[in-house]
Amino acid sequence: MLPFWIALQFLSSLPVRLSGMPEPREMGRSLLCYPLVGLLFGLLLWLASHLLQGAPAPLHAALLLTLWVLLSGALHLDGLADSADAWLGGFGDRERTLKIMKDPRSGPIAVVTLVLVLLLKFCALWVLVERGAGALLVLAPVVGRAAMLGLFLGTPYVRPGGLGQALAEHLPRQTAGWVLLGSLLLCLLLGGWSAIWPMALALGVFLWLRRLMCQRLGGTTGDTAGAMLELLELTVVLGLALAT
């Protein structure tokens, strides 16, 4: 169970406290639990949506989005903001991009990106709420966190000595493949036919974003992994809103 608690502590704002620093091997194994953390988030969103039945759809969607952000402590939104600033401000240069990514300040590109992503997610949630498709909310958090596992499985980590390097080096790769397959089957089981098009769209976005990372950076960082998670969650909820 330790890898799950490590993953939950890292990916969420839930009050999880570990005694001491985990071993690198356990850190690597915690990646296997990322889709499970996503499933937990999705079930909490589904429960919240059920409890909010009867509330006006815009308020319902806004409260769901607020809970969604609070569950992760806006961790991945921070990565998205840093990546947006760095990608445009880096002008195609690897070292400049990495340097900007480490700057804690957010520029106008980061702000605009966050506003657009949250606005689109809010609108998609509004559509799903109005159509009574709250159960499909489980899918996006699972896909986003499974994508992080897939990214670390098949993409070099470019910041030596960082937490991400320990995760990537000690990830049980064969087991990770089975976890990804199980995550895919779970999403198809939960979403049925409604999940096929959004899942295919998410796969396409994953491959495109990974290609951009490899072309610019030669791999991934924690910030770009967080950005990918946010963009894939958005892709799934938009796909579901358009497909249902």
UniProtKB/Swiss-Prot annotation:
Main localization, broad class: membrane
GO molecular-function term, one example from the UniProt record: cobalamin 5'-phosphate synthase activity
EC number: 2.7.8.26
Pathway involvement of the protein, from the record: Cofactor biosynthesis; adenosylcobalamin biosynthesis; adenosylcobalamin from cob(II)yrinate a,c-diamide: step 7/7
Compartments it resides in: Cell inner membrane
InterPro entries: CobS
Cofactor(s) named in the record: Mg(2+)
Top EC class of this enzyme: transferase
Magnesium found in the keyword field: yes
Function: Joins adenosylcobinamide-GDP and alpha-ribazole to generate adenosylcobalamin (Ado-cobalamin). Also synthesizes adenosylcobalamin 5'-phosphate from adenosylcobinamide-GDP and alpha-ribazole 5'-phosphate.
PANTHER family associated with the record: ADENOSYLCOBINAMIDE-GDP RIBAZOLETRANSFERASE
Family listed: Belongs to the CobS family.
Protein name: Adenosylcobinamide-GDP ribazoletransferase
Chain's gene name: cobS
